[in-house]
Amino acid sequence: MALILTFMAPACASANETSVNWFMKGYTLYYEEKFSDSLDAYNKALELNPKDSEAWNNKGIDQGLLGKYDDALSSFETAVALNDSYAEAWFNMGVIYDIKGDYPTAVQAYKRATEVDPSYHKAFVARNVDTDLLMGRSLSCACQDQLALV
């Protein structure tokens, strides 16, 4: 039994390193603005480690930048299903709902981001902007003061 465990552990570590390597490749390609290639790398990372909430979030970012908004939402939803306290994924979900013009749902996503991380100023500002839009008002003074934080 010990012999089997000895052989299994290195195999698991190797698969994990490969997942991390694909993740880092996706990250690098994203910063080179090669979003399609970055998306491919995140897909490969997720084949090896489908429970990586960061890879799901980053995949969603690439999908959003490529105009695949429904796919992006699905990726962000998977990220928060794996890690409900992932404020950035909640924020990114709100951004996509904003792009789609679904401000009430965007407000809920931003609200969740600020519940998870009260210091997440971008989500706080975006929530206030959308709330003002929904209420048919111009930006409130409090919200205008926060815009510098974005």
Question: Model-derived features: where do they sit?
Answer:
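C-terminal segment of classical bacterial N-terminal signal peptides
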Residues: 5-12
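Terminal, low-structured helical/coil segments at or just beyond the last alpha-helical repeat
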Residues: 12, 19, 121-150
